[in-house]
Regions:
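Beta/alpha (TIM)-barrel catalytic core signal, keyed to glycine-rich beta->alpha loops juxtaposed to Asp/Glu
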Residues: 1-160, 164
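Short, intrinsically disordered, charge-balanced linker/junction segments flanking boundaries
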Residues: 166-168
Length: 168
């Protein structure tokens, strides 16, 4: 569908296209879900056509803000004052043809962290891109259920906190 719609860009003149882009989906989207397409391809196709990108799922449903202790420590060692979520937002915001990065915020702390991250945005360096690619590869080595904590499964009739169980 994506390629078909882009093939009609000359006729339809898209103002922007919304894509899912984060440091896991950049090169590993199919490993997360076989129906997905790598964000690197999606973004490159938009750049070819000079179409701005609106980014959704920069935190991969919140998973990139809840890394395991080992992965979190690797990012914190590099930038101790920044949140783990800020790495994902910086990754998404670094690309020049990104119009905006969407962020689902629940708490005031999320908004404050986003403001610190984007005002002003400090783009990721090549070294940081490499670290995030390594983080993505390591994440995929851990057996997980791809739960994005949407809570559609809640409330559980048996009183179980299903998203919390799947997280661990």
């Amino acid at each position: 569908v994506f390629d078909y719609l882009l093939s009609r860009h000359d006729e339809l003149k898209w103002d922007f296209v919304q894509i899912q882009l984060n440091y896991v989906d950049w090169r590993h989207a199919k490993e997360v879900n076989t129906r997905n397409t790598d964000a690197e391809y999606l973004y490159a196709e938009l750049v070819k056509r000079n179409i701005p990108a609106v980014i959704m799922e920069p935190l991969l449903g919140g998973r990139l803000s809840r890394l395991n202790d080992h992965l979190m420590a690797r990012l914190k060692q590099r930038r101790p004052q920044e949140s783990v979520a800020s790495w994902a937002f910086r990754f998404a915001g670094t690309f020049p043809d990104v119009l905006t990065v969407l962020s689902g915020m629940t708490y005031m702390e999320h908004l404050q962290d986003n403001l610190r991250t984007f005002s002003p945005l400090v783009p990721c360096t090549e070294e940081e891109f490499t670290l995030l690619e390594d983080t993505a590869q390591r994440m995929l080595q851990y057996p997980t259920v791809p739960c994005n904590d949407c809570k559609y499964c809640m409330p559980c009739p048996y009183g179980l906190d299903i998203p919390a169980i799947l997280l661990h």
